[in-house]
Each structure stands twice: as C-alpha cells, then as structure tokens.
Amino acid sequence: MAASARDVCPTPGAWVAVSDSGRSVRGSDAVTAELAQRRVVLLGESHDNAEHHRWQLHTIAALHARQPRLALGFEMFPRRVQPVLDQWSAGELTEEQFLARSDWTSVWGHDPQLYMPIFHFARMHRIPMIALNVERTLVRRVGREGWDAVPPAEREGVGEPASAPAPYP
C-alpha cells in the first residue's frame, strides 16, 4: 500500500527523525537546539531546488541564533577560491565580482540566485565561508591513477583517506 503524502512529508517546520526503531516527527526548536551542540552539521539539498535552499537558509539562521560561532562549508568551491570567499564575507565584493572571481560558472554552474540568500546571510553576519572542494583535475587524476599515485604536494592539502568502518567491505 502506498504511503500518503502526510505519512511521508512532515508539516512545514517539522523534522523527521529516522532511527532503527522507526520514524518520529520532531519540532524545529528541539532539533535546532540539538544541532547547535554539534561540531559539524551537514545540510544537503537538490542543487536546483529553491525550497531546499530556503530550508537550508532557515536552518542556518536558527543555528546561528543559538550558536553565533559558526562557519559554513561549501562543496562547490575549490580551495583555491578561499581568498574570494574571505573577501565576500568581509563585504569587499559585489555579487558580480564574487561570482566572477569564484569562477562560479565553471566550478558549479547551477543558478547562483538559489545560493545567494545563504551567501548574503553569511556576509551580513560575518560568518566564515569555507571552500571544501578540490579542483576537478585532481578528482579526475585520482580516479584515473589512484590516490597513491598523486604526490602529497599535489593533493591540495587533502590528507590520507580514513579507512572504511567495520560494517563496510
């Protein structure tokens, strides 16, 4: 029997907690209070979904209200553009300059207007923005040659990968 939308999607402002014992719906305040105690919180989205980005912004704002010492990491930016992110957060660049200098079109390419509200929030509150990615050439090289074939000096600061946890082959 197919699940109804009510069974799958919580009401706006609610979160679904999934565990071994099943699903439960939790209020935003309770979840935000718990998340604000964590060192790292990952907020995923479909890159082209405006609602997902709005949810991310609301979650970031709620976390910032509880934990102002916050930093935001972004998967789309290679580490080489970190100085641009720093300039943006410091209020030194226009949107156009930020998008051009971060090489937005080639490093990401999705509609920047989906992301700009989050970038503006970070800038408005002087929240550090962290470039988390590496250059595509490094990704392709590792795929082609393997991690061990890349000299440490050419790994863009990335350390040795951690071993897989026991449940994984």
Language-model features: where?
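Short amphipathic alpha-helical segments and helix-helix/interface helices
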Residues: T32, I60-A61, M116-F119
